[in-house]
Amino acid sequence: MQDKNNLCWLDMEMTGLNPETDRIIEVAMIITDSDLNVLAQSEVYAIHQSDELLDNMDEWNTATHGRTGLTQRVRESSHTEAEVEQKLLDFMSEWVPRRATPMCGNSIHQDRRFMVKYMPKLENYFHYRNLDVSTLKELAKRWNPPVAKSVVKRGSHKALDDILESIEEMRHYREHFLISAPRAEAQ
């Protein structure tokens, strides 16, 4: 059910970091309530890309996506970016009104750059703000290093795993880093 206070978490895996030359190869989405309780998760979509594009990935992406099996899943997938964009829009619209949720995740600006180019309707459904866990990570490193060091990262580089890890990391910062005050009912 739609709720303007729900949060939409997203992660993408790409063939590289440049949206002008690289492409999205995996994406997943999770909806939480404002207290970070998971309400729903989308399917994990591997998006078909050409062999030429996959064969030209840099060393890190070739090794990482090869190790996780993503490269093979992408080769075998029949999903297009447009098809996945529509499926994610349909999923998201069940839970969050248009432009109500910030885009949530880790280093989410990078995902947004790719979304602007390859999934613009989905990007436009989000609020223009980002809820980026990496901002809290950078602040904790500088202002409270023990809190930053106590975060355990698995770094699987699988979209769904990375989202769950981002939500867990946000819970950690909420509990150990952010000042806790009595919560007023959201208006």
Swiss-Prot record:
Matches recorded under SUPFAM superfamilies: Ribonuclease H-like
Residue span(s) of domain Exonuclease: 7-170
GO annotation (BP), single: DNA metabolic process
Domain of life (superkingdom): Bacteria
Cellular component per GO, a single term: cytoplasm
Classification via Pfam families: RNase_T (PF00929)
Residues the record marks as active site: 128
Annotated localization: Cytoplasm
The EC number(s) this enzyme carries: 3.1.15.-
A molecular-function term among this protein's GO annotations: nucleic acid binding
Keywords: Cytoplasm, Exonuclease, Hydrolase, Nuclease
Family label: Belongs to the oligoribonuclease family.
UniProt cross-references to PANTHER family, sorted A to Z: OLIGORIBONUCLEASE, MITOCHONDRIAL (PTHR11046:SF0)
Function: 3'-to-5' exoribonuclease specific for small oligoribonucleotides.
Protein name: Oligoribonuclease
Protein's organism: Neisseria meningitidis serogroup A / serotype 4A (strain DSM 15465 / Z2491)
